[in-house]
Each structure stands twice: as structure tokens, then as C-alpha cells.
């Protein structure tokens, strides 16, 4: 059996549930039912719902074989785990921030000052790398208020959009750490349970598919070479003969290709200009290596 720890609530919960569903491993239950354990469609893969901050230690200690959580939390806990895959969502930055009216303009201005944070280890390492001595004050919440009540001169805190800083009259003066959600594994489990890599491959196939689109079109046989020059494809386009019920009609080929999603606008217009018609653009659910 493989046990996967995923966030039980918060901004990482729903994207994680959706990713597993798209990968063919839908999870029963979730935050709404307040359950601790759940099953997937694979009888050998079970789910453990946990606080995102606790998942690195759960995986390190073997309570879970695999986990999904933010790289900021993994780094802060110093967890001895194997990072398998950047899942590309849950983007956030740990920023160094000071009051809007503060005279501090950079980290170096904080020499000998107090910095409050929920991420003391990352914060200490950041200032150590800069050769700056500060007093790090660990708080468990409401970090934004500490400069306004005299507890600290600055804070290091998570900022996804900057709105919370703005509301609390704070300004960011540096980025301390950039984070996304990662798939991690217990090192011993990774060696002993081959299915962990199957899980990684399934999730990765969904991430790869989101960046691609499937193109289908009809192409006059005389225009095939021009169309091939437009289509990059993953391993060249697929070309098939289109059967016509009328022998007098122009001969057509069906051309299929996988292309980068962000190139669709440009490619479709080029294809039309070289004679392609009946062009279909289709989302892809998964791309398996």
C-alpha cells in the first residue's frame, strides 16, 4: 500500500484534489467531510489528509510514502525527503517587508534589527547568506501586525498577490524565497515501492498536457509540405488519406499534430494561409512519456 499525504484545507487543497482526479486517481471525500483518510480508484493507493505544514515531516518519518505540499514548508522544516516533481501551482513568495513609512530600503538596512516571521529557518539562512545579523522572532500568526506594535522592525511572510501587505500598510523590499507545490517522497519508500514513480508519471502527464493542444485539419495534398513546415509537433505530424465519395474532388489529407498551447494563435493563422481548412483545436487530458 502507498499512502499519500495531501493538504486537508486551504488554498492547496482543491488544486491538489483536481490534479489527482485529472490524473485518473480521484479521491473520495475531502475537506468538506473532515475525514482523515480516503481511498482512490486504485486499491493500493490511500490518502491521508494533513496540515500542509506537517506533510514534510510525515513523509520524512514514513507516516506517508508520498506528499504534496509547498517547497517553502519543505525547506523550513528541513525535511530529508526526495523532491520528485514541481507541480507548478500554489505559487507564492516569502517577502521581506517593512512599514510603508519606514526608512529601511533594503535588507542591509536591518543590521541589528528585529524580524518577525513564521519561517525562522528560511529567514535566518537568508540573512546569513547576506552576512547580516538580525534577531529573528518566531510568531505563529498575524505576522503583519508586529511592526506596528513595536515587536519587530520588519517581517518575512508569504505574499501571493501583495494585497495583505497593502491592507496592513507594509511594503516588500526583497524576495526571500519563491515557492510552488511539489510532490515529495520518503527516500526508503521510493526505493522499495515502484508504484510511487507511476504516481509521479500520472501527475506529470497532466501537467504536460496543460501546455499542449491537439490540432486536426484537412489539407490539400499539394499543400502538405507547406503545412509540415508550419507544424513543429512532438515527433512530426500524423498524415492520413481522406476518402472522398466524388472522384473529381481535390485530394485531401487529414493532418494531426500536438503543438504548444501558447503558439496556437500564430500557428492556426499560418496554417490557414498555406491552405489548411476545417481546423480543430482540442485540449489534451494527459500526455504519457
Swiss-Prot record:
Pathway: Amino-acid biosynthesis; L-histidine biosynthesis; L-histidine from 5-phospho-alpha-D-ribose 1-diphosphate: step 1/9. Keywords: Amino-acid biosynthesis, ATP-binding, Cytoplasm, Glycosyltransferase, Histidine biosynthesis, Magnesium, Metal-binding, Nucleotide-binding, Transferase. It is an enzyme of class 2 (transferase). Feedback inhibited by histidine. Its EC number is 2.4.2.17. Signal peptide: none annotated. Its main location: cytoplasm. Gene3D superfamilies: 3.30.70.120, Periplasmic binding protein-like II. It is found in: Cytoplasm. Its cofactor is Mg(2+). It comes from the Archaea. GO terms for cellular component: cytoplasm. It catalyses: 1-(5-phospho-beta-D-ribosyl)-ATP + diphosphate = 5-phospho-alpha-D-ribose 1-diphosphate + ATP. One of its GO terms (biological process) is L-histidine biosynthetic process. One of its GO terms (molecular function) is ATP phosphoribosyltransferase activity. Catalyzes the condensation of ATP and 5-phosphoribose 1-diphosphate to form N'-(5'-phosphoribosyl)-ATP (PR-ATP). Has a crucial role in the pathway because the rate of histidine biosynthesis seems to be controlled primarily by regulation of HisG enzymatic activity. HAMAP family: HisG_Long (MF_00079). Belongs to the ATP phosphoribosyltransferase family. Long subfamily. NCBIfam families: hisG, HisG_C-term. This is ATP phosphoribosyltransferase. The gene is hisG.
Amino acid at each position: 500500500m502507498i499512502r499519500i499525504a495531501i493538504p486537508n484545507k486551504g488554498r492547496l487543497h482543491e488544486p491538489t484534489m483536481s490534479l489527482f482526479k485529472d490524473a485518473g486517481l480521484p479521491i473520495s471525500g475531502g475537506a468538506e467531510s473532515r475525514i482523515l483518510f480516503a481511498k482512490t480508484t486504485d486499491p493500493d493507493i490511500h490518502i491521508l489528509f494533513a496540515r500542509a505544514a506537517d506533510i514534510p515531516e510525515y513523509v520524512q518519518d514514513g507516516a506517508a510514502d508520498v506528499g504534496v505540499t509547498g517547497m517553502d514548508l519543505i525547506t523550513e522544516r528541513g525535511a530529508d525527503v526526495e523532491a520528485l516533481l514541481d507541480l507548478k501551482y500554489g505559487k507564492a513568495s516569502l517577502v521581506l517587508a517593512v512599514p510603508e513609512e519606514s526608512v529601511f530600503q533594503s535588507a542591509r538596512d536591518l543590521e541589528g534589527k528585529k524580524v518577525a516571521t513564521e519561517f525562522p529557518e528560511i529567514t535566518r539562512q537568508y540573512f546569513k547568506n547576506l552576512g547580516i545579523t538580525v534577531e529573528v522572532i518566531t510568531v505563529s500568526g498575524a505576522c503583519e501586525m508586529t511592526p506596528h506594535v513595536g515587536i519587530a522592525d520588519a517581517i518575512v511572510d508569504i505574499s501571493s498577490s501583495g494585497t495583505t501587505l497593502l491592507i496592513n500598510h507594509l511594503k516588500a523590499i526583497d524576495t526571500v524565497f519563491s515557492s510552488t507545490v511539489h510532490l515529495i517522497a520518503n527516500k526508503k519508500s521510493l526505493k522499495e515501492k515502484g508504484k510511487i514513480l507511476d504516481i509521479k508519471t500520472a501527475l506529470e502527464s497532466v501537467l504536460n498536457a496543460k501546455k499542449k493542444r491537439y490540432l486536426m485539419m484537412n489539407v490539400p495534398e499539394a499543400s502538405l509540405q507547406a503545412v509540415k513546415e508550419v507544424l513543429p509537433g512532438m515527433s512530426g505530424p500524423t498524415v492520413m488519406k481522406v476518402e472522398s465519395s466524388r472522384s473529381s474532388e481535390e485530394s485531401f489529407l487529414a493532418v494531426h499534430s500536438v503543438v504548444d498551447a501558447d503558439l496556437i494563435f500564430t500557428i492556426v493563422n499560418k496554417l490557414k494561409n498555406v491552405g489548411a481548412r476545417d481546423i480543430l483545436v482540442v485540449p489534451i487530458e494527459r500526455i504519457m512519456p
